């Protein structure tokens, strides 16, 4: 594994548009080095016979079948409006011509 340098951290910070304080560069260099070490360990794990997954535990949706039902509440809903004009809701004008 390639060693991470302070210059690498500065370059990544610049690419990510992060303004890192100079006194924290060494801290971030050390932390990034450890993270990449963990990734290197994961690369050593044999996953040849393991199928790709997106979750550790399988999740399934509980779906119901859509059933089309006739309803006759249109007039009731329109009557709930504070102001109506025929089959439409009447609302205050918000745009000028």
From Swiss-Prot:
Keyword Ribosomal protein on entry: no
InterPro entries assigned: Asp/Glu-ADT_sf_sub_c, GatC
Pfam families tied to this protein: GatC
The keyword Cell inner membrane belongs to this UniProt entry's keyword annotation: no
Annotated EC: 6.3.5.-
UniProt-listed GO biological process terms: glutaminyl-tRNAGln biosynthesis via transamidation; regulation of translational fidelity; translation
Keyword annotations: ATP-binding, Ligase, Nucleotide-binding, Protein biosynthesis
One GO MF term: glutaminyl-tRNA synthase (glutamine-hydrolyzing) activity
Similarity section: Belongs to the GatC family.
Function: Allows the formation of correctly charged Asn-tRNA(Asn) or Gln-tRNA(Gln) through the transamidation of misacylated Asp-tRNA(Asn) or Glu-tRNA(Gln) in organisms which lack either or both of asparaginyl-tRNA or glutaminyl-tRNA synthetases. The reaction takes place in the presence of glutamine and ATP through an activated phospho-Asp-tRNA(Asn) or phospho-Glu-tRNA(Gln).
Subunit structure: Heterotrimer of A, B and C subunits.
Name under which the protein is recorded: Aspartyl/glutamyl-tRNA(Asn/Gln) amidotransferase subunit C
């Amino acid at each position: 594994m390639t060693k991470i340098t302070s210059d690498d951290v500065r370059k990544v910070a610049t690419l990510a548009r992060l303004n890192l304080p100079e006194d924290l560069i060494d801290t971030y260099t050390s932390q990034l080095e450890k993270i990449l070490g963990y990734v290197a360990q994961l690369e050593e794990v044999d996953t040849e016979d393991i199928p790709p997954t997106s979750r550790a535990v399988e999740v399934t949706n509980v779906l119901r079948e859509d059933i089309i039902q006739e309803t006759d509440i249109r007039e009731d809903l329109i009557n709930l409006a504070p102001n109506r004009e025929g089959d439409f809701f009447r609302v205050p004008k918000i745009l000028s011509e």
